[in-house]
Amino acid sequence: MTKMFQVKTLQALAACTIINESIPIFPSSIPSTMFEELQTLYSLFCLRKHEKVLDEKVDRLKVERQKAIEKSDDYHMDSSVLFAINDYVAGFDAENLGDYWEHCASIITSHIEKLEEEKQEISQEEALYLCKLGNTYNKI
């Protein structure tokens, strides 16, 4: 009966913490057997929150990349539009606006790839926390 109570209490505390981070939970009021589980749940919650922010950034960058690609296509078709960018601007010389927008799209793509890598690392860390929680609940 005590173990079942601990699981239910842990689930309730975790739910409250995840729904509203401002709810104060005092370590002295939490049984020591549950404190580590709460820390793990909160870490998992933080990872998921960060992952959501990364998803939003990736989505915005994909939209910007698409705009850059469209501008590149538009300007490549109009060969009369030419300009030069100084060497110190992004370290890139362009013969026309199409090349410039292609360059912008490639930079955005590299940022998206970096964010995707970070999301993969977060997913792996989440899996570890979930395994840790699974092992804890199996013990209880």
Go through the PLM ranges and name each one.
Residues 1-78, 93-137:
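Cullin-RING E3 adaptor/co-adaptor recruitment helices
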Residues 79-86, 91:
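Amphipathic alpha-helical repeat scaffolds of TPR domains
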